[in-house]
Structure formats: structure tokens, C-alpha cells
From Swiss-Prot:
It catalyses: heme b + (2E,6E)-farnesyl diphosphate + H2O = Fe(II)-heme o + diphosphate. Keywords: Heme biosynthesis, Lipid metabolism, Membrane, Mitochondrion, Transferase, Transit peptide, Transmembrane, Transmembrane helix. The lineage of its organism: Eukaryota, Metazoa, Chordata, Craniata, Vertebrata. This is Protoheme IX farnesyltransferase, mitochondrial. Its main location: mitochondrion. PANTHER family: PROTOHEME IX FARNESYLTRANSFERASE, MITOCHONDRIAL (PTHR43448:SF2). It is found in: Mitochondrion membrane.
Length: 443
């Protein structure tokens, strides 16, 4: 029988030494399977798997012992900003400067300040002055009511009611009254003129009341009374009410209900439709043209009490005249309308603005030729009106082709004298009525 290794070693070494060697060999042989299994377990822990490479920052991980020690790839050093200064340890340290106090140092009244203290006082005074200037400018931009003088009130109310525009409205109403068939009634004519003027003042005042925040952004309208604070909004609304109520009452009771209804409808159309529509759509120009075409119709209905073909012809002439007039005006004010937030053809549709102006210049030729057909004027009127209608059509064509400020100004100034001259020619060439010149019937 073969002897085991530990028996051989124990035979060679006798005594205590042999016993110790025998015990160690036996212990080693018994513990070897357990150590082998323990070694396999530790080796499995040290293997690198796919999960070690699945980090978002792609860190290279190496396990040294049982605890995981991660070695991260060093990041590049950031570029030093002009506000940071590198220290000896390699870290960035923010450099903070102490600000000088704005308040001047207190000086005793018993001694005079020296030159150094005066130099320190100067920057603080400059800063305080700049702050005061900023506050003053901010206060200037705020709306505040100015002190109203009694002798300034008529001029302020005249500008609030747009007295020149009101005079134009009254003149077109008077032309419609004079062109209507029938005898000329002076009391009715005066009542119609006064009522129409009051209605126009009311509509213009309410229009300015609604457009205060927008008029302040335009050079053309920034000096209006409400924008400058020369009059309070309450006083402006009260003035508009005091004009609208008696104006509509005079037209309704003093003239006829039809004329009063047209006056009330025109106030509503101008204040509640045209005014808000100016910031919504370019259709405001067509609505505003209808507003301007109603006054001559009111003059016709005041004289006749009915809506005839002549009333619509006068309204059509005023309707077409307003497009070259206003489109040429708005062309030179495109920057102001855009800054004020108004939606105008000259700003959003410049090509359409020029085409519409030319189209209605040519329409004036057709409407003038229709006057004798409707038995309003004689045939001499379209012949006499041909030169001025042809001239404004030519300027409308130049405005359409050139599309510049010079051509728009020429068209605008031509429209200012074109309408009064055209209405004067209509009055001159008015067809006489046979019954008006006839004598009393024989008894």
C-alpha cells in the first residue's frame, strides 16, 4: 500500500517537528477545496462586464479591491474668463471689487472740505443728477392733466372736435341741400347745417377719446388736447354728449326724422365701427369712406325728405373722392401709422393702396357723366368738370406708377381743391326746375 505524502514527511521528521509538519500538511489538504471555491468567487467579481461601459459620461472604471474605485478621465481645464483669476492651486477664484459708496462722506460744518474730499463728492453728485433727470423724463412720459384756463377752452374744444374736418362736413351737407330739387328753405338749411356740425363735433371728440394711447405715438396727432392733457377725458366725453344730443334732436325735430336717423347712424358708424376697425383691418378705409359720403345725403334728405337717385350720386362722388385723398395722405404717414398700431393700406398693402386711389380717380369721371343722366345737372357739367377730373386721374396714375412721397403729396394737395371746385361746378350747372320760376296761376 502506497504511503500518503504526509506520512512520508512525518517518518522523515520525527518528534515535535514531524508532528507540526504533519498537522500543516493535513490542514492544507483539507482547506484546499474551500480556498479554490473562494478564489473562483473573487475572480468572478473582478471580471469587467458590459455594464461598466454603459455610463452616459463614458467613465473608465477599474476595480482594485472589493470596493469599486472609479478613475474618471480628467476634464480639460476651463478657459479663464476675464472676471476670474487662477490661483496657485489651479482653481479659479472670483475677483470681487468693492464698490464705492454713492452717498457722499459726512463733513463737519466747522471746517472746509479739502480738494481730495471735493473730488470724492463729484461722482456722487453726478450720479444723483442722472437719477433726477431719469425721474423727470419718466414723469414727462406719464399722462397728467394740465391746468385749464378759461380763455383757452374754445380753442381746445375746436381742436378736440376737429373744426376743419367739421367745416368740410357741413359744406358737403350744404351742397347736398342746395343741389336737391325744390325751393330753397333758409330756416331748414340753417337747422341742417347746425345739426350736422354738432353731430360731427360729437363723433370727432369720441374718436379722439378712444385713440389717446395710439395718437401719442404719431407725430401728426401727438399734440391733440387729450394727448397733451389740456383737457380731461371726462370733460371731452361731456362735450361730445352735449353736442350729440342736441345735434340729433335738431335734425330729427327741426328737419325730419330721416335726416336725424342718418345723423345718429353716422355717429355710431364713425365711433363704434370705423375707430376700432383702424387697428384691426384695412376695411376701415371703406367704412370711413361711407361715413364721409353720408353728409351730402343728409343735405339732400333735409331738402326733399326722401332718398332719391341724386342723393346716392352725391354720396358716390364723396365716396370715391375720399380714396385718392386719404390714400395719398396715409402714404406719407406710413411710419407714423405703423408706430401707432393702425392697420392701413399704405402700411400693409402698398400696392392695393395705389390701385384703389387710381381706380376711384377714374370713377369720378363716370360719376360726373352720370349727373345729367339723372337730371341733376345739365350736360355742361361733365364737360366743364372734365379737365379737373382728368388732372386728378393723371396724378393718381403717377402715384400708382412712381409710388413715392412726391407723387402722393401732389395727389393729396390736388384733392384739397378738387372737391370744392367740383361741387361748385355742380351748383353752377344745376338743372333749373320748371315749376320754380313759374308765376302764380291765372285766376
Amino acid at each position: 500500500m502506497a504511503a500518503s505524502p504526509h506520512t512520508l514527511s512525518s517518518r522523515l521528521l520525527t518528534g515535535c517537528v514531524g508532528g507540526c509538519v504533519w498537522y500543516l500538511e493535513r490542514r492544507t489538504i483539507q482547506d484546499s477545496p474551500h480556498k479554490f471555491l473562494h478564489l473562483l468567487r473573487n475572480v468572478n467579481k473582478q471580471w469587467i462586464t458590459f455594464q461598466h461601459f454603459n455610463f452616459l459620461k463614458r467613465m473608465y472604471v477599474t476595480q482594485l479591491n472589493r470596493s469599486h474605485n472609479q478613475q474618471v478621465r480628467p476634464k480639460p481645464e476651463p478657459v479663464a474668463s476675464p472676471f476670474l483669476e487662477k490661483t496657485s492651486s489651479g482653481q479659479a477664484k472670483a475677483e470681487i471689487y468693492e464698490m464705492r459708496p454713492l452717498s457722499p462722506p459726512s463733513l463737519s460744518l466747522s471746517r472746509k472740505p479739502n480738494e481730495k474730499e471735493l473730488i470724492e463728492l463729484e461722482p456722487a453728485s453726478v450720479i444723483e443728477d442722472s437719477i433726477d433727470v431719469g425721474k423727470e423724463r419718466k414723469e414727462e412720459k406719464r399722462w397728467k392733466e394740465m391746468k385749464l384756463q378759461v380763455y383757452d377752452l374754445p380753442g381746445i374744444l375746436a381742436r378736440l372736435s376737429k373744426i376743419k374736418l367739421t367745416a368740410l362736413v357741413v359744406s358737403t351737407t350744404a351742397a347736398g341741400f342746395a343741389l336737391a330739387p325744390g325751393p330753397f328753405d333758409w330756416p331748414c338749411f340753417l337747422l341742417t347745417s347746425v345739426g350736422t356740425g354738432l353731430a360731427s363735433c360729437a363723433a370727432n371728440s369720441i374718436n379722439q377719446f378712444f385713440e389717446v394711447p395710439f395718437d401719442s405715438n404719431m407725430n401728426r396727432t401727438k399734440n391733440r388736447p387729450l394727448v397733451r392733457g389740456q383737457i380731461s377725458p371726462l370733460l371731452a366725453v361731456s362735450f361730445a354728449t352735449c353736442c350729440a344730443v342736441p345735434g340729433v334732436a335738431i335734425l330729427t325735430l327741426g328737419v325730419n326724422p330721416l335726416t336725424g336717423a342718418l345723423g345718429l347712424f353716422n355717429i355710431f358708424l364713425y365711433t363704434c365701427c370705423y375707430t376700432p376697425l383702424k387697428r384691426i383691418s384695412i376695411a376701415n378705409t371703406w367704412v370711413g369712406a361711407v361715413v364721409g359720403a353720408i353728409p351730402p345725403v343728409m343735405g339732400w334728405t333735409a331738402a326733399t325728405g326722401s332718398l332719391d337717385a341724386g342723393a346716392f350720386l352725391l354720396g358716390g362722388i364723396l365716396y370715391s373722392w375720399q380714396f385718392p385723398h386719404f390714400n395719398a395722405l396715409s402714404w406719407g404717414l406710413r411710419e407714423g401709422y405703423s408706430r401707432g398700431g393702425y392697420c392701413m393700406m399704405s402700411v400693409t398693402h402698398p400696392g392695393l393702396c395705389r390701385r384703389v386711389a387710381l381706380r376711384h380717380c377714374l370713377a369720378l369721371l363716370v360719376l360726373s357723366a352720370a349727373a345729367p343722366v339723372l337730371d341733376i345737372t345739365t350736360w355742361t357739367f361733365p364737360i366743364m368738370a372734365l379737365p379737373i377730373n382728368a388732372y386728378i386721374s393723371y396724378l393718381g396714375f403717377r402715384f400708382y406708377v412712381d409710388a413715392d412721397r412726391r407723387s402722393s403729396r401732389r395727389l393729396f394737395f390736388c384733392s384739397l381743391w378738387h372737391l370744392p371746385l367740383l361741387l361748385l361746378l355742380m351748383l353752377t350747372c344745376k338743372r333749373p326746375r320748371g315749376g320754380g320760376d313759374a308765376g302764380p296761376p291765372p285766376s
